C-alpha cells in the first residue's frame, strides 16, 4: 500500500470515529504513524485530503461499469452488478460527503478542488453511459435508448436508496439491497422496452 493510500485510509477511519469537524491533520499523522508534513507531500491542504477520501472508492466502481465489459454476460446482469457496486460506494461515501457539505469552508474548498482537477461525481454517470453506448453498438440495446438517461435512471435511485437508509438509521422498505436492485433494473428494462415500442 502506498503512503498516499495509508493516509487516506487513516483519515477515513478518523472521520467515521470522531466526525469530520473534530479531525485534525495532527491526529491523522498520529493515526498513520507519519510526520504531519508528510501529509502535505501528497495533498494540497486538509480539504484536498478530505475530498480525496470521498472519491477513494470511485475507481473500482468505474472499472465495473467500463465499456470493456460490453458484450459479456447479459445487459441486465451487468446493470445489476453495477447497481450493487454503486450502492456499496454510496453507502461508504454519503456519511463522509454529508460532513463536508455541512461545513461551508470545506464545501467551498472541495468544489474548487473539483474544478481544478476537472473531477466530480458526474464522471460516474458518463462512464456508465459509455457502457450503454457500447452495448448499443453491439446491438444489445436498441439505438433509440438514451445512454445518459439509462445511467441517471439506474444510479440516482441507488443513491437515494442509501440516503434514505442512512437518514432513518434503518431499512424501512424491508427488502435487501439485491432485491432493490432487481426491482430497479426490471423496472428500467420495462420502461426502455415500452419507450422503444412507442417510438417504433
Question: Which residue stretches match the model-derived regions?
Answer:
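Short amphipathic alpha-helical elements of helix-turn-helix/winged-helix folds
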Residues: 10-14, 52, 85, 157
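Short secondary-structure transition hinges
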Residues: 88-127
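Amphipathic alpha-helical linker/stalk segments
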Residues: 54-82
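Short, structured helix-loop boundary elements
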Residues: 4-5, 25, 47, 72, ...
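C-terminal peripheral helix-coil segments that are non-catalytic and often amphipathic
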Residues: 77, 81, 88, 122, ...
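Short coil/turn segments at alpha/beta junctions that flank glycine-rich nucleotide-binding fingerprints
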Residues: 17-21, 93, 138
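Helix-turn-helix
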Residues: 6, 14-48, 52-56
Amino acid at each position: 500500500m502506498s503512503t498516499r493510500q495509508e493516509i487516506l485510509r487513516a483519515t477515513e477511519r478518523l472521520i467515521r470515529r470522531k466526525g469530520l469537524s473534530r479531525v485534525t491533520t495532527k491526529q491523522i499523522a498520529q493515526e498513520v504513524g507519519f510526520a504531519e508534513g508528510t501529509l502535505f507531500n501528497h495533498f494540497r491542504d486538509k480539504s484536498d485530503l478530505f475530498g480525496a477520501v470521498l472519491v477513494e472508492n470511485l475507481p473500482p466502481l468505474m472499472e465495473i461499469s467500463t465499456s470493456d465489459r460490453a458484450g459479456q454476460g447479459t445487459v441486465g446482469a451487468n446493470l445489476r452488478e453495477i447497481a450493487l457496486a454503486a450502492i456499496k460506494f454510496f453507502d461508504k461515501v454519503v456519511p463522509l460527503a454529508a460532513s463536508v457539505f455541512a461545513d461551508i469552508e470545506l464545501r467551498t474548498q472541495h468544489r474548487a478542488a473539483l474544478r481544478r482537477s476537472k473531477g466530480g461525481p458526474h464522471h460516474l454517470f458518463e462512464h456508465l453511459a459509455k457502457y450503454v453506448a457500447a452495448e448499443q453498438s453491439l446491438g444489445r440495446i436498441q439505438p433509440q435508448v438514451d445512454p445518459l438517461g439509462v445511467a441517471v435512471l439506474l444510479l440516482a435511485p441507488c443513491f437515494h436508496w442509501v440516503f434514505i437508509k442512512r437518514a432513518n438509521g434503518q431499512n424501512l422498505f424491508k427488502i435487501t439491497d439485491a432485491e432493490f436492485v432487481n426491482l430497479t433494473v426490471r423496472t428500467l428494462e420495462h420502461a426502455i422496452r415500452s419507450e422503444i415500442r412507442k417510438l417504433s
